[in-house]
Design a protein with these regions (language model features):
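Amphipathic alpha-helical dimerization/coiled-coil segments
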Residues: 88-111
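Short beta-strand/turn micro-motifs at beta-sheet edges
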Residues: 4-8, 68-69
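Accessory beta->alpha helical hairpin/"wing" motif in late/C-terminal subdomains of nucleic-acid enzymes
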Residues: 82-86
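N-terminal helix-turn-helix DNA-binding core of bacterial DNA-binding proteins
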Residues: 6-50
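Basic amphipathic alpha-helical segments that dock to polyanions
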Residues: 51-58
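Beta-hairpin "wing" of winged helix-turn-helix
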Residues: 59-76, 81
Length: 111
């Protein structure tokens, strides 16, 4: 069987996944993308063209705070930290996602 190809993220889920990965602590963009890939067992692969606009949007909304730091390989990197407003937003997005998944599950079971 050929290897499964990466799946497309559902619209509106990238912010949720980024915020969720930052719950355990700050990370740089590449680290966030790798964490999403790892946790999804290689189903989701977040490209730079999606990741960095999302991080900018989350920064502008006050959900993450960027700070310059040094990565594990001794390079300068921008680290993102979840803010208290980001934690509230994450909780709201998780509730909404669960509501939508529940509705989809109902249709699949009852149709």
């Amino acid at each position: 069987m050929p290897p499964a190809r990466p799946a497309e993220l559902l619209p509106g889920t990238l912010d949720l996944l980024i915020l969720r990965t930052l719950v355990r602590g700050s990370n740089h963009g590449y680290g966030i993308a790798q964490r999403v890939k790892e946790l999804s067992r290689d189903v989701f692969q977040v490209g730079e063209s999606s990741l960095y606009p999302a991080l900018q949007r989350l920064t502008l909304n006050g959900y993450v705070k960027p700070e310059w730091g040094v990565s594990d390989n001794n390079r300068r990197a921008r680290y993102y930290t979840l803010t208290p407003a980001g934690r509230k937003q994450l909780a709201a997005e998780e509730r909404e996602f669960e509501r939508i998944v529940g509705a989809i599950r109902l249709v699949l079971e009852l149709a």
